[in-house]
Amino acid sequence: MADQYHEPVSELTGKDRDFVRALNSLKEEIEAVAWYHQRVVTTKDETVRKILEHNRDEEMEHAAMLLEWLRRNMPGWDEALRTYLFTDKPITEIEEETSGGSENTGGDLGIRKL
């Protein structure tokens, strides 16, 4: 457990440790998506493929839940996600356009526009 911290645990608040837990879990979920996806695209058995697709998609849901928790709780995530998600703008040009900020999307992340 100590290897997940780069600073003394005693100097971290409970909330900071929750951030570490969520971030580590997010990394694990993303890794699981990658593993399942590789299995999906290489299996020859259709039934196995469908099961693995289901498992991969479940991991995506878990990752999305963790991102939402981070957005609501850890400073910086809300602004970053509002800036870069749910837009058709070229990803590499968004930061230049916003100068590090983001426009007000009315609290829906622009989803209603989809």
From Swiss-Prot:
Cofactor(s) needed: Fe cation
Sequence segments annotated as region (Cargo-loading peptide): 86-114
Annotated positions binding Fe cation 2: 29, 59, 62
The UniProt record lists the keyword Iron: yes
Compositionally skewed regions (Gly residues) per UniProt: 103-114
Annotated residues for binding of Fe cation 1: 29, 59, 62
Keywords: Encapsulin nanocompartment, Iron, Iron storage, Metal-binding
Practical applications: The 15 or 30 C-terminal residues can be used to target foreign proteins to the nanocompartment.
Region (Disordered): 94-114
Any GO molecular function: metal ion binding
Signal peptide positions (record): none
Any one Gene Ontology BP term: intracellular iron ion homeostasis
Keyword Metal-binding part of the UniProt annotation: yes
Any one Gene Ontology cellular component term annotated for this protein: encapsulin nanocompartment
InterPro entries documented for this protein: EncFtn-like, Ferrit_encaps, Ferritin-like_SF
NCBIfam families in the record: ferrit_encaps
Protein role: Cargo protein of a type 1 encapsulin nanocompartment. A ferritin-like protein that probably stores iron in the encapsulin nanocompartment.
Subunit organization: Probably forms a decamer which binds to the pentameric axis of the interior of the protein shell; as the Flp cargo protein is flexible, packing into the shell is not rigid. 3, 4 or 5 cargo decamers bind inside the encapulin nanocompartment.
Swiss-Prot/TrEMBL domain comment: The C-terminal 15-30 residues (cargo loading-peptide, CLP, or targeting peptide) are sufficient to target this protein to the nanocompartment in vivo, while the C-terminal 5 residues suffice in vitro.
Protein family according to the UniProt entry: Belongs to the ferritin-like superfamily.
Name this polypeptide is given: Ferritin-like protein
